[in-house]
């Protein structure tokens, strides 16, 4: 290589490094877009907006919500995966996009594992509800009741391929249960079906269920996760009754495009964790039946990989075909 050519390449690299460093020093100098794969008005959208306010206070720039709902959350994820990696476009990611979509869509237009984790935000527990007159009062009794009545019972969930559906199917496989699945479009339909006795039991998010549990309209038999709930510590988990693989809660975390500079990532992580652990934000989560979640980013990625590994076999077993 000619000396002049080598010197020019060294100078170019130095300029790029200097530009990257200068960008990190001044970041953020304009508003940040938070791409949310859910429609406006739901609990996830509200959580995003609350977190965005806390982040903006820390960063000194607005964090603007852009709602991009779509099947599998693909549109929102693609928007961020293909965005300029400068920290100004970030993603609210969830279990749907990261642990279900890879098994349900053959040719994703991006690589999920290249999205960089900023920080986790929360989990949204899913509880198994029954009417007050249902014979079982907890998971232990429910399991025995299903075994005593094989093929005679059914359960509702808030959709095919959701964490509720997959978690219950894993529980069925783990414990040898014979109970039919009836999917509904969201919690509202599931609650109506349970009340109308279309289904015997139903998995519903705690956000939608907690007021009805406290009012005695329904009783909670179990929760689909590893640990007991802060708000309802008497409710058994599916893991503690022998279904060790069924703890698949709904979760959300923030992510950045691949290649985002480390210094920018550190600023985003610091602002996000500051917002998500603020007492007012934690109180907001608890009041809405949602649990704060604050593992390290390394533990977050291990958790996502574990969920991805567990969801694949059960999706195949129940016959869901990739599109």
UniProtKB/Swiss-Prot annotation:
Annotated keywords: Periplasm, Signal
One GO CC term, this protein: periplasmic space
The UniProt record lists the keyword Signal: yes
Superkingdom of this protein's organism: Bacteria
CDD domains the UniProt entry points to: PBP2_Bug_TTT
Cellular location(s): Periplasm
UniProt main location, coarse: periplasm
Signal peptide location: 1-24
Family: Belongs to the UPF0065 (bug) family.
Name the record gives this protein: UPF0065 protein BP0148
Organism: Bordetella pertussis (strain Tohama I / ATCC BAA-589 / NCTC 13251)
């Amino acid at each position: 290589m000619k000396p002049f050519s080598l010197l020019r390449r060294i100078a170019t690299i130095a300029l790029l490094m200097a530009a990257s460093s200068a960008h990190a020093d001044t970041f953020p100098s304009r508003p940040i877009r938070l791409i949310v794969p859910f429609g406006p008005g739901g609990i996830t959208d509200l959580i995003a907006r609350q977190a965005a306010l806390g982040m903006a206070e820390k960063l000194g720039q607005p964090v603007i919500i852009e709602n991009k709902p779509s099947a599998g959350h693909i549109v929102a994820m693609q928007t961020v995966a293909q965005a300029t990696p400068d920290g100004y476009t970030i993603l609210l990611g969830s279990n749907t996009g990261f642990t279900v979509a890879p098994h349900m869509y053959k040719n994703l237009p991006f690589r999920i594992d290249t999205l960089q984790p900023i920080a986790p935000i929360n989990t949204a527990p899913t509880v198994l509800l029954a009417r007050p007159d249902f014979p079982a009062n907890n998971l232990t009794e429910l399991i025995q009741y299903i075994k005593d009545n094989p093929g005679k019972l059914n359960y509702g969930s808030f959709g095919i391929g959701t964490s509720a559906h997959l978690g219950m199917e894993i529980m069925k496989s783990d414990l040898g249960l014979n109970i039919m699945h009836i999917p509904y479009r969201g919690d509202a339909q599931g609650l109506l079906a349970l009340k109308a006795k279309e289904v015997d039991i139903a998995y519903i998010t705690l956000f939608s269920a907690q007021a009805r549990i406290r009012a005695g309209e329904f009783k909670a038999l179990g929760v689909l996760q590893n640990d007991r709930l802060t708000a309802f510590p008497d409710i058994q988990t599916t893991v503690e009754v022998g279904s060790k693989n069924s703890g698949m809660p709904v979760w959300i975390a923030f992510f950045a495009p691949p290649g985002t500079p480390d210094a920018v990532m550190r600023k985003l992580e610091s602002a996000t964790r500051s917002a998500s652990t603020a007492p007012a934000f934690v109180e907001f989560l608890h009041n809405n039946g949602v649990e704060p979640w604050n593992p390290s980013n390394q533990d977050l990625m291990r958790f996502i990989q574990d969920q991805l590994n567990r969801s694949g076999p059960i999706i195949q077993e129940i016959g869901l075909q990739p599109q």
